[in-house]
Amino acid sequence: MTHLIDLFKPMIPSLLNNLHKGQSGRIAIMGGSKEYTGAPFFSGISSLKIGSDICHIFAPTEGGTATALKTMSPDLIVHPIEKNDPSDIIPWLLSLHVIVVGPGLGRSSGAWSCASEVIKAARNINLPIVLDGDALRLICDNLDIIKGYDKAILTPNFVEFKSLSDSVKKMIGDTSNNLLKPEHIASCLGNITIVQKGKEDIITDGNQTVVCDDEGMPRRCGGQGDILAGTVGTMYAWSQLYYKYNSNTDDKPEYPISIISAYAACSLLRHCSKKAYQISKRSTVSMDIINQISNGFEDLFPESSK
């Protein structure tokens, strides 16, 4: 659906000499745990490689997670969070354009409690949210955390989608063994946007549905979902900024900007994965994909750097 790529192109910030730092996106990633340090890094560095100006990472001090992340890239602003204290994160929300919650979050009660408070605070100020990884398992335990918030994008893989389906079925009293369709889940949750990742990426808000079936790669290395989460977050922030600051955008877009942004992100990841696989084949890892973002972005959006 190249038409959706065309719809997204105007939302890409122009590279102008009179812009100041932050105008092309202030993104945050909340995640990481003593087991998973790579996930928030993949999300954050992908955001910067795509073109966001600033990326914060809120990561726990437990297990040296935040310290490890600080050594991975000087371009990322890493905030060590002591004892999963949400008050270390919430004051920053007003300065952000989007927050991505979940990459490498883990399943500790402290991390989940902190994430819940951050999501609630983000909702209170109408901040766009992308939920990925263990943040999806968190909301499966309490759908009210996200229900009705149409500025949320969920990016479940197959296992996470099944958990989400089971939780929504319980909420609506569906006792069948059937897996709900993503459109039904999105509708039941108040028309939030869902990106069901798979052989084809199904993107829906319950009212409209699009499918990204661009060629990707057959290799299934860890970290691809984290790259997508950071990419979705960045592109969603750009679309929000575009409609906020452009006076000639009164016309309602053909699709919700959450769907347009998510589709563009899925298409870019698939394209970069394909390019990486052509070089590295079976040895392809997530950093190979990230290293293709620069050229891959120019392939899809050739006018964006002019």
Swiss-Prot record:
- Cysteines engaged in disulfide bonds, as pairs: none
Required cofactor names: Mg(2+)
Q: Which residues bind (6S)-NADPHX?
A: G104, N157, F158, V159, E160, F161, K162, S163, D226
Reactions catalysed according to its record: (6S)-NADHX + ATP = ADP + phosphate + NADH + H(+); (6S)-NADPHX + ATP = ADP + phosphate + NADPH + H(+)
Q: Name one Pfam family in it.
A: Carb_kinase
Gene Ontology biological process terms in this record: metabolite repair; nicotinamide nucleotide metabolic process
First-level EC class:
lyase
> What keywords tag this UniProt record?
ATP-binding, Lyase, NAD, NADP, Nucleotide-binding, Phosphoprotein
Provide any one GO MF term from the record: ATP binding
Annotated residues for binding of ATP:
197-201, 216-225
Q: Which residues form the YjeF C-terminal domain?
A: 4-300
Q: Which SUPFAM superfamilies does this one have?
A: Ribokinase-like
Q: What is its EC number?
A: 4.2.1.93
Q: Which InterPro entries match?
A: CARKD (IPR000631), Ribokinase-like (IPR029056)
Q: Family, per the entry? A: Belongs to the NnrD/CARKD family.
Question: What does this gene product do?
Answer: Catalyzes the dehydration of the S-form of NAD(P)HX at the expense of ATP, which is converted to ADP. Together with NAD(P)HX epimerase, which catalyzes the epimerization of the S- and R-forms, the enzyme allows the repair of both epimers of NAD(P)HX, a damaged form of NAD(P)H that is a result of enzymatic or heat-dependent hydration.
Q: What is this protein called?
A: ATP-dependent (S)-NAD(P)H-hydrate dehydratase
